[in-house]
Each structure stands twice: as structure tokens, then as C-alpha cells.
A protein has these predicted regions:
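Structural signature of PLP-dependent enzymes
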Residues: 262-266, 285-307
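Active-site phosphate-binding strand-loop segment of PLP-dependent enzymes
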Residues: 152-217
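A short helix->loop->beta-strand "cap" motif at the edges of active sites that frequently abuts
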Residues: 122, 143, 198-203, 230
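Active-site PLP attachment segment
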Residues: 225-261
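Conserved PLP-anchoring active-site segment centered on the Schiff-base-forming lysine
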Residues: 116-138
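PLP-dependent enzyme catalytic core of the Aspartate aminotransferase-like
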Residues: 86, 94, 163, 335-337, ...
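N-terminal small-domain helix-loop-helix segment of the aminotransferase-like
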Residues: 12-105, 112, 285-287, 391-392
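Conserved glycine-rich beta-strand-loop-beta hairpin in the small C-terminal domain of fold type I
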Residues: 282, 298-307, 318-331
Length: 392
């Protein structure tokens, strides 16, 4: 007899992210045909060029031997909170350890922040294009989601449009710099802050997971604008800076009253982030930074290689992102929609990318391409794209 499971209606908000579809199709095609797929769709580091630094691995092993396998204080190990506070202060947001909470990745920090502030009927504004998985928990509590379109080609906020969307019910504004999926920095945090000051009930969640992966311009945080330290939750992670994506450790910086609420949430949900992983993160942040400097320089070279290659593909145009490890290429010259181009590319050329519409309606006409892979894969992928000549 079939079982009828009494699922909550809210679980319907949890669906696989659209970018996962590209990965699944590519993986299935690779398995069924034996064809080597060039994986430009993965939002992760690939290959031996990007592996967690050796001293971080060594610190993890030592932490296990030293007995860091028990519960720890929920907000995080004191030494790690101190290190994060010092690092955050370098960007101009003077931070005390008690303003830091260690989380199971940036997504966890964002989830807790959304659930701490939002309830049914509240409004939250997300950028478009953006990162739709971040919206799930707002939907879960039945908050009203608004999308502010970013202006092309540099993907910035139209402040007049943004402010027109704010009502007395608007609690949160989500910003992301460098941005997913296009890699551009938010260039005017001071102007955004000025707008926020006109709306005293508005809080900002600033997703800054690529804060240390910028190339030509320095990273800036809205939390460094005087007065915004009390209005902003800054979210960051060890994933991108130290190639620790699978370790699931990040943090949030916020005023102490907010950290206190997040700490209760964390302790009642996951209890704490694994102590030995926190020791690894401390080793990453407090140890030599040569790896990060070298890998950021390497990513810049790969960015330039990828952008030059994409601009040689028929019907494709691509500008240089300021940071992150994605390029957001304009494929309107091909005559195809984003999804059509994505599907045809993996089927005919064995190159997997993500349709821009996976990140919102403003992504139509674009594809996201990851360049955190080998030079050989970049060259081979671009060569296949050129040979496929996907132009109507």
C-alpha cells in the first residue's frame, strides 16, 4: 500500500536550483556517451590549481589529534572570532569579536538572518540577476519578495528605482559584492547607504563571499559607511578565499543584539560548527596569505584568458568581471535565448554553462561561465564553442 506522506505545504518552496540542472544534464551526458564534458557550469574550484592550502589541512589533522571533537561555544571559538573581527576591520568596518558569529557556510548565515528578521507579509528586496537559492527562506515564511533590476552593462543598482520599491513593510535589502553571477563590484555603497538612512526600519544583508577575490578594484563594504555598521549584516566565507567550499564554514558580522539572536538560532539548530573545522579556518586566516595572493593572481589570468576566448566566439560578447570566478557573457548576438543556447551548447559541443535566466529574468541573453578550472579546459571549451558556431 502506498504511503501518503503528510508533507508541509512550505516544503514546496524547496526546489533544486536551476543551475543544478545544467550540472545534472552534463553529468548524465558524460556518463551515457563517454564524451568529456567541459564543465564551465560548476560554481566551484576545479582541478589541482585550487586545493585547500597544505597548512590548513595540517591544522585540521592536529586539531583532531588535540581533541577538538566536542561541542564548543555556539557563536564560535574565541580565537577565530577575534581573527574574523580583525580581518573585517581591514575593510573599514571596525569590528569586535562579539560582533562575529561563525556559521556553517555563508548560506547558513544568510538563512539565519532572513529567518531572524522576516515574517509573513514583510518585504525583502533582492537584486535581479542575483542568486535565487537565497530567496527560499523568505518564501518559506511567506514574506513578499521584490526584485530590483540591475542596470546593464555594469550591473549596478538604479537607486531611484530601488527607493521607489521601499515601503513601510520593507525590512531587508540584499546586496552582493562582488556579485553573483556577473562578478561586478557594487560601486556606490555610499549612495546606497544614504538611501538607507532615509528608511530607518530598513536593514541590509551584504553578501560578500568573494571579498578577497577581486582583481582590478578594491573590495568595498557598505558596512564601512559611518552609521551603516548598525544597519548591516555582512556575510562572508572561507570557501572562496581559501578554496574550502566543501568545509562549510563562514561567518556573519552584525551589531551585538543581532549576533545574540543569531547565536540562539544557531545553538537551537546545529549547536555549533565543528570545532576542528573552526581550527582549520583559524589556521587559514591567521597563517600565511601567500596562497590567497597567488591564487587570486592566477584567477585574474584565467579571467583574462576566458574573456578573450569568449569574445572570439561567434555571437558572444563578454566584459571583464571585477572579481569572483564567473564571467557573464552576452549571447544575444547568437539569436538564441539563454536556455536554448545552453542546451544546444552542451548537446552539440559538450560544453556545459548555466543559462543567465537561472539567476533571474534580467539574465536573459546571458550565460554564466566559470573560469576556476585548468587553462587546458578553458582553451578546449572555447575552441568547441567556436567550432559549434551557434548562431541563427
Amino acid at each position: 500500500m502506498a504511503v501518503s506522506y503528510p508533507f508541509s505545504s512550505k516544503i514546496s518552496h524547496f526546489v533544486p536550483p536551476k543551475q543544478w540542472a545544467s550540472m545534472r544534464i552534463a553529468r548524465d551526458l558524460e556518463k551515457e556517451t563517454g564524451t568529456k564534458i567541459i564543465h564551465f557550469e560548476k560554481g566551484d574550484y576545479q582541478g589541482p590549481d585550487f586545493y585547500t592550502p597544505d597548512h590548513v589541512l595540517a591544522a585540521t589533522i592536529q586539531a583532531l589529534k588535540d581533541g577538538y571533537v566536542r561541542y564548543d561555544p555556539g557563536p564560535g571559538l574565541p580565537e577565530l572570532r577575534e581573527a574574523i573581527a580583525a580581518e573585517t576591520s581591514k575593510f573599514g568596518r571596525k569590528t569586535k569579536p562579539e560582533e562575529v558569529i561563525v556559521t556553517a557556510g555563508a548560506k547558513h548565515a544568510l538563512t539565519m538572518s532572513l529567518l531572524t528578521f522576516l515574517e509573513e507579509g514583510d518585504e525583502v528586496i533582492f537584486p535581479n540577476p542575483g542568486y535565487p537559492p537565497d530567496e527560499v527562506w523568505a518564501k518559506y515564511v511567506r514574506a513578499n519578495i521584490k526584485h530590483v533590476p540591475l542596470t546593464k552593462p555594469d550591473w549596478q543598482f538604479d537607486l531611484e528605482k530601488l527607493e521607489s520599491m521601499i515601503t513601510p513593510k520593507t525590512k531587508l535589502l540584499i546586496i552582493n559584492t562582488p556579485q553573483r553571477p556577473n562578478g561586478h563590484l557594487v560601486e556606490n555603497p555610499e549612495a546606497i547607504a544614504e538611501m538607507c538612512f532615509r528608511h530607518p526600519n530598513l536593514m541590509v544583508i551584504s553578501d560578500e563571499i568573494f571579498s578577497h577575490v577581486t582583481f582590478d578594484k578594491p573590495h568595498k563594504t557598505i558596512a564601512a559607511v559611518p552609521g551603516m555598521e548598525d544597519r548591516t549584516i555582512v556575510i562572508d566565507t572561507f570557501s572562496k578565499t581559501y578554496a574550502m567550499t566543501g568545509w562549510r564554514i563562514g561567518w556573519a558580522v552584525a551589531p551585538v543584539p543581532v549576533i545574540d539572536k543569531l547565536s540562539i538560532f544557531l545553538q537551537d539548530s546545529i549547536t555549533n560548527v565543528a570545532a576542528f573545522i573552526q581550527k582549520a579556518a583559524y589556521a587559514a586566516m591567521s597563517g600565511p596569505q601567500d596562497w590567497t595572493v597567488e591564487k587570486t593572481a592566477l584567477l585574474k589570468k584565467k579571467r583574462d584568458r576566458m574573456v578573450a576566448g569568449l569574445n572570439s566566439v561567434p555571437g558572444v560578447k563578454c566584459d571583464s568581471p571585477d572579481g569572483a570566478f564567473y564571467a557573464f557573457a552576452d549571447i544575444t548576438g547568437t539569436g538564441y535565448t539563454s536556455q536554448e543556447y545552453t542546451d544546444k551548447l552542451v548537446e552539440s559541443a559538450g560544453v556545459a554553462v548555466v543559462a543567465g535566466t537561472a539567476f533571474g529574468s534580467q539574465g536573459e541573453g546571458y550565460i554564466r561561465v566559470t573560469y576556476a578550472c585548468s587553462d587546458e579546459d578553458i582553451d578546449e571549451g572555447v575552441s568547441r564553442m567556436k567550432e559549434a558556431n551557434l548562431v541563427k
